[in-house]
């Protein structure tokens, strides 16, 4: 299955529920008027795009319809793809320009954090990079065990301490091992909780100091893993973590299991955070780099009138 087909399949639930309704609504109109835009805005909010983003999309559509003299309601879907592509375009690449580079992965329990790390390690290894994992989410024994399973599956080394160990010490040992083995990428599973923002900030700043001391000037990504099925709650979670953690991007998992695919737009617009990867299935290669144009095409597919 090709890249676009994977994303299209992963967004099927969102497309079936919301995009189907938008298509039906547009077919019911014979002209483009204010009522059409009001109905469209409501449907976008239902897709977890968020009120502000839905309003912004419709305002942009109004302006373009006027500029281009568009009168056919069925042209709106193509315009929608265009506007959404522009909206979610940004710095979606991973910046891994040094040897080693460091990826810190954070997120609350249950969002698919460990699975994401395993899939990311597999992807980077397939690209010819040597990867080493650090089990620095030491709060849960299960997190360490799950990461070991993924390390074995991806055939990459893992550095771990006992449950309850200092996460910064794990990161220190992982960096030391990476330097000794000339690894290309260090991926550390870090903070899996957000009940105390100060503790989280302290933990992450301590980890950052360890990295800065051990690998000055290294490329560093701080990725937050979010569960798409939680919709607007994912946006709220991202807002909290953004304040505490200096995020560089988002990994949005479980997109295939929800009709809330519009949350990608809310994260991008409300928080200014790029989505770097999306999870669209269970398989290792179902963690896909985010592509704005393919996402917009797959989400707002124009359908011929029945």
PLM feature spans:
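Terminal, Lys/Arg-rich, intrinsically disordered segments and adjacent short helical elements
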Residues: 16, 304-305
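Short hydrophobic/aromatic residue motifs in ordered secondary structure
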Residues: 51-53, 140, 256, 284
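Conserved catalytic-core segment of NTP-binding enzymes
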Residues: 146, 163-181, 195-304
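Short beta-strand segments
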Residues: 106-107, 189, 225, 279
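Primarily NTPase-proximal linker/entry elements flanking Walker-type ATP/GTP-binding cores
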Residues: 13, 17-136, 143-188
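Short glycine-rich anion-binding loops that position phosphate/pyrophosphate groups of nucleotides
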Residues: 191-193
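Short acidic DE-rich linear segments
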Residues: 2, 305-306
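Compositionally biased, charge-rich terminal segments
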Residues: 1-8
């Amino acid at each position: 299955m090709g890249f676009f087909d994977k994303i299209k399949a992963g967004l099927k639930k969102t497309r079936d529920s919301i995009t189907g309704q938008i298509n039906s609504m547009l077919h019911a109109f014979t002209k483009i008027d204010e009522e059409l835009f009001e109905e469209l805005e409501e449907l976008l909010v239902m897709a977890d795009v968020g009120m502000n983003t839905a309003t912004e999309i419709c305002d942009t559509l109004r302006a373009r319809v006027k500029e281009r003299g568009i009168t056919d309601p069925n042209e709106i879907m193509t315009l929608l793809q265009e506007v959404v592509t522009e909206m979610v375009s940004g710095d979606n690449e991973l910046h891994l320009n040094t040897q080693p580079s460091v990826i810190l992965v954070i997120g609350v329990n249950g969002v698919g954090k460990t699975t994401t790390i395993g899939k990311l390690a597999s992807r980077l290894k397939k690209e010819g990079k040597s990867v080493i994992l650090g089990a620095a989410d030491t709060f849960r024994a299960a997190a360490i065990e799950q990461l070991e399973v993924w390390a074995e599956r991806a055939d990459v080394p893992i550095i771990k301490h006992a449950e309850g160990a200092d996460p910064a010490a794990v990161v220190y040992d992982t960096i030391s091992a990476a330097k000794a083995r000339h690894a290309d990428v260090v991926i550390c599973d870090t903070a899996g909780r957000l009940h105390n923002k100060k503790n989280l900030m302290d933990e992450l700043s301590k980890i950052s100091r360890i990295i800065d001391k051990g690998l000055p000037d290294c490329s560093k990504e701080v990725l937050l893993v979010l569960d798409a099925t939680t919709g607007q709650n994912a946006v709220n979670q991202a807002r909290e973590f953004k304040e505490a953690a200096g995020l560089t991007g988002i990994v949005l998992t479980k997109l295939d299991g929800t009709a809330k695919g519009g949350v990608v737009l809310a994260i991008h617009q409300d928080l200014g955070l790029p989505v770097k990867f999306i999870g669209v299935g269970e398989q290792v290669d179902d963690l896909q780099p985010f592509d704005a144009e393919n996402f917009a095409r797959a989400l707002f597919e124009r359908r011929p009138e029945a």
